[in-house]
A protein has these predicted regions:
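Short acidic-aromatic low-complexity motifs
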Residues: 16-20
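Vicinal oxygen chelate
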Residues: 1-13, 23-121, 131-144
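C-terminal catalytic core of tyrosine-transesterase DNA break-rejoin enzymes
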Residues: 124
Length: 144
């Protein structure tokens, strides 16, 4: 079995409100780079976003290709999943993301599992957790 070299075995495919707005946000907020983009009359109807040379998400706007899928935000619900992505500097990425319009859910903090971690929500209501490994995990109390 084969796959493209820059594509992981699993890639989330999101529905976004606006392909153009999502392309702009993910580049400004998270530093993602646009990969393959299908543009119909100036409207992105499919896009791949890359991080460190790998595709991390693909997306299409609501209504594209006859889809009835909607974003968490347009449905008025909290996204049931969080995307977890390692980065070089979680504090810098958090500042960049919130400066670009992401909503803070959890500011950066050292976590018991050994990462410095934060969580933000993008304009479409998807939640993103970013982490940087700590040199040493904090001391954790064992679960009884």
């Amino acid at each position: 079995m084969s796959r493209p070299s820059n594509t992981p075995w699993l890639t989330p495919y999101l529905t976004v409100a606006s392909g153009r707005a999502a392309l702009d946000f993910y580049q400004r907020a998270f530093g993602f780079k646009a990969g393959h983009v299908v543009d119909e009359n100036g409207v992105p109807t499919h896009a791949e976003m890359q991080y460190k040379g790998q595709i991390v998400i693909m997306f299409a706007p609501e209504g594209a290709w006859g889809s009835t899928a909607r974003t968490p935000r347009s449905m008025g619900v909290e996204a049931p999943q969080t995307f977890y992505l390692y980065c070089e500097d979680v504090d810098a990425l958090y500042a960049r993301a919130t400066g670009a319009g992401a909503t803070s859910i959890m500011p950066p903090a050292d976590q018991f599992w050994g990462d410095r971690y934060c969580m933000v929500e993008d304009p479409d209501g998807y939640r993103w957790g970013f982490a940087t490994p700590l040199a040493k995990a904090p001391d954790a109390k064992p679960t009884p």
